[in-house]
Amino acid sequence: MVATLLRDDPAADVLIVERGDDVGGTWRSNTYPGAACDVPSALYSFSFAPESGWKRAHGTQAEIYAYLRRVAREQGITQRTMFGCALRDAQWDGDRARWVVSTSRGDLTADVLIAATGALSTPTLPKVPGLEMFRGTMFHSAEWNHDHDLTGKRVAVIGTGASAIQFVPSIVDKVEHLTLFQRTASWVMPKRDHGIASSVRSLYRRFPLIQKVVRGAVYSQKEMYVVGMTKPFARKYALPLFEKRARSVLRKQVPDPELRDRLTPDFAITCKRILLSNDWFPAITRRNVDVVSSALTSATENGVVDAAGNEYPVDTIIFGTGFTPSEPPVAQHVRGEHGRSLAEVWNGSPSAHLGISVNGFPNLFLMYGPNTNLGHSSIVYMLESQAAYIADA
């Protein structure tokens, strides 16, 4: 998004502080098997940097990471970035009308501070008694241990969200047994993924306008979901059709009525994120999979325990327990004109004007700020809109 600022003023004194060793954010860090985007490739790219080479309708982690690295290089972003540099503290100095920023590589000041740490950057682990005693291997899906071979292992997967729904089908054939802890069932819809023919990619390269038209059509189709989510008449008539479709998928792919009942959400569709997958239900109905309808309550030296006290022997625990979008860690390190941190001001309920600026924090702008996430389309569109707003400011 810095590219938006630099296009208006190429000479702008812009410095990016990045704690990682490369650009890419979540697509650099999340390398678990099966990692891919649930937003169509046509939308999951910057308007100023169209990509004609997507090989699938939904980009894979490797494709998206390569795209982000290329755009950063071409837009001159990497030359303005201090990699391996973590933010320690940022304090507004009212006397000088500047931000005083402390990092792991020294201090600096800035007229404007932009917090673009993302909503899916810090993995969260549940506080489970006994984890410190577990003798096996455990890791979060966002910090996948590629050195640990899962072949023939007894694996416990904690969580059934957007990450688990991708990596579980990718590992289920390798493991001896998989125990899946599901605290809350999710609505699952088919993922309209398919390969993009080389002839189509060539057409996009030769005639960029065609790709723009396709992008516009996909965007318009996705925006129709908003009507179903927000308009009373549509909620009454359209959402039941969505739910009927999701129930149909569940009925066809899960023959066991008892398991099907446990996999059926007890809330209306769109109240939580709809998950997209073609192989989730077939994966978790395999003979070597047990679905436990409870949270993980404790761990032992050699296993995990459910809410009913049943223990399951496992060699490996994989946490698909998500991130901290409602409590971004950066909020603890940014202090405004009264010396209070963002976390203290928000007090567990983040809010910001347009999701971008917060009263009492002058010249601070948030990217992917509170309440700007989407349940139907591409966050990239939101980020570009925020970047344009910040550039204007």
Stretch-by-stretch model annotation:
Residues M1-D22, L108, A115-P255, V289-D290, ...:
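Rossmann-like dinucleotide-binding core of oxidoreductases
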Residues M1-T81, Q182-R183, K252-E258:
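Beta1-alpha1 glycine-rich phosphate/pyrophosphate-binding loop at the start
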Residues V17, L87, D107-L120, V155-I158, ...:
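Short hydrophobic core segments
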Residues E51-R70, M82, F233-F242, F267-D279:
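Short beta-strand to alpha-helix junction loop
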Residues K55-S121, A246, Q253:
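Feature captures the FAD/FMN-dependent oxidoreductase FAD-binding
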Residues M82-R98, D147, R287-A307:
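A conserved short coil-to-beta-strand element within the FAD-binding core of flavoproteins
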Residues P240-P313:
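Alpha/beta-hydrolase fold catalytic core
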Residues G320-A391:
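Glycine/threonine-rich phosphate-binding loop and adjacent beta-strand/alpha-helix elements that clamp
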